[in-house]
A protein has these predicted regions:
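Short amphipathic alpha-helix that is part of the acyltransferase structural core
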Residues: 1-27, 125
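Conserved beta-hairpin
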Residues: 34, 41-56
Length: 133
């Protein structure tokens, strides 16, 4: 499994990843999705030979904050350490950044995953997160 910079946006493979995990909100306006990828701070892909099987996308200023916007692994490749490798690669790249944040589903599975790589839920720190959609 190779983790490397995702440089050439291919709409079909990105759509495949998002659909495989049931993320459809972005797929209604693919032109915006393509712009979002182009304007991201960092996008890394996980490759099985030449096949894109996972992706992580980070946004932010790269100095004081990095926000992990997307992390997706094809279902048949999940539970094999790929998500961990993707996340750790971004964490290493931005190890000197003051804070790294993400927003995820409120399930024990996702909370356990992010805690296992060193993240803390904001409410455990006496904080609250707000979102406007």
């Amino acid at each position: 499994m190779d983790i490397k910079k995702y440089e050439n946006f291919h709409l079909e493979e990105i759509i495949n990843l998002y659909q495989s995990v049931g993320w459809t909100n972005y797929l209604e306006r693919t032109n915006i999705l393509e712009e979002a990828y182009a304007n991201s701070l960092c996008v890394l892909g996980a490759y099985d030979s030449d096949r894109l099987v996972g992706i992580i996308r980070a946004v932010g200023d790269g100095r004081t904050i990095v926000f992990v916007q997307d992390i997706i692994v094809l279902p048949e490749y999940q539970r094999k350490g790929i998500g961990t490798k993707l996340l750790k690669a971004v964490m290493e790249k931005y190890k000197d950044v003051y804070q790294m944040e993400l927003l995820t589903d409120n399930t024990e599975k996702t909370k356990a995953f992010y805690r296992s790589v060193g993240f803390t839920a904001s409410d455990d720190m006496g904080c609250v997160a707000f979102i406007r959609m």
